[in-house]
Regions:
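Conserved FAD-binding catalytic core of PHBH/FMO-like flavoproteins
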Residues: 1-129
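Alpha-helix N-cap and coil->helix boundary residues
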Residues: 40, 191-194, 229
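Short linear loop/turn motifs
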Residues: 127-132, 249-252
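A generic structural signal for secondary-structure junctions
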Residues: 32-35, 50, 91, 186, ...
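Conserved mid-domain beta->alpha element of the FAD-binding
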Residues: 18-23, 75, 109-110, 130-222
Length: 252
């Protein structure tokens, strides 16, 4: 084990190991063959804008979503309404280094990728002085429990199932993983490898469903041409029920 702050190396012989080390997990390589995360070709442009400089029509306690060809934007208040959080997802050029997650962003690149915008969205995006750029990666949906645990090693969160942000469930699934992991770890009547097997059996299928639904949502949000007209008509006719996911919010 290498201590990040001091660089000191220490050899440990733990009873069990949990890999919660994110998208570029090293622990994952002890459970599965070493492969790189999948490049989606999408970037998430992110910013926080003080609410006092937000256009008046957007100073509300609502979540607002714009969808368009190969893009979508989500805006919502945070910190008790003090700031407006903005996330804009569109195709873009990857940074040279991929091991970080937060990079400087050139607003001109973002606006070029977005194309023609609704005036309300354009106004608020242009009010942002500084944008950040997050490359989006994922992995294919889990195919079996063996992809989340092996022997005395278990994977949690993005180390096991990184997902696209189109369902906003990456952190949620990691929290559910942690709760299931704690439940299984408490099974002191079982050997460690059986506890982790039980954990993986509890979690893999739900995580796979969320991964797959996130990919599906992205395709819907970013539709182009006649398909987006059909999407818009369906949204007008069906309203919120079109995107409803009761199986998700009912819990595992």
């Amino acid at each position: 084990v290498k201590h990040l702050q001091t660089g000191h190396l220490e050899t440990l012989n733990p009873q069990a190991l949990v890999g919660a080390d994110g998208l570029w997990s090293d622990t994952r390589n002890y459970v599965l063959p070493k492969t790189a995360p999948r490049i989606t070709g999408l970037l998430a442009y992110r910013a926080l804008l003080p609410m006092q400089v937000v256009p008046e029509f957007l100073r509300q306690q609502d979540v607002r979503v714009w969808v368009g060809p190969r893009m979508h934007a989500v805006l919502y208040p945070v910190r008790g309404g003090e700031f407006l959080n903005m996330v804009v997802i569109a195709p873009g050029q990857l940074p040279e280094s991929l091991k970080d997650w937060d990079y400087d962003a050139n607003p001109q690149d973002m606006f070029q990728a977005l194309g023609v915008l609704h005036p309300h969205l354009k106004d608020v995006l242009e009010a942002v002085p500084n944008w950040r750029r997050w490359p989006i990666f994922d992995r294919p949906p889990l195919a079996s429990a063996t992809q989340m645990a092996k022997g005395r090693i278990a994977l949690l969160g993005d180390a096991a199932h990184p997902m696209r942000p189109f369902l906003a469930q990456g952190a949620g699934m990691a929290i559910e993983d942690a709760a299931a992991l704690a439940t299984c770890w408490a099974r002191v009547d079982l050997p460690v490898n059986e506890r982790w097997r039980l954990y993986a059996e509890m979690r893999w299928a739900r995580n796979a469903m969320v991964q797959a639904r996130s990919i599906r949502n992205g395709r819907i949000f970013h539709m182009q041409g006649p398909m987006r007209w059909g999407r818009d008509l369906a949204m007008r006719l069906m309203g919120e029920s079109l995107m409803d996911v009761p199986w998700l919010y009912a819990g595992p």
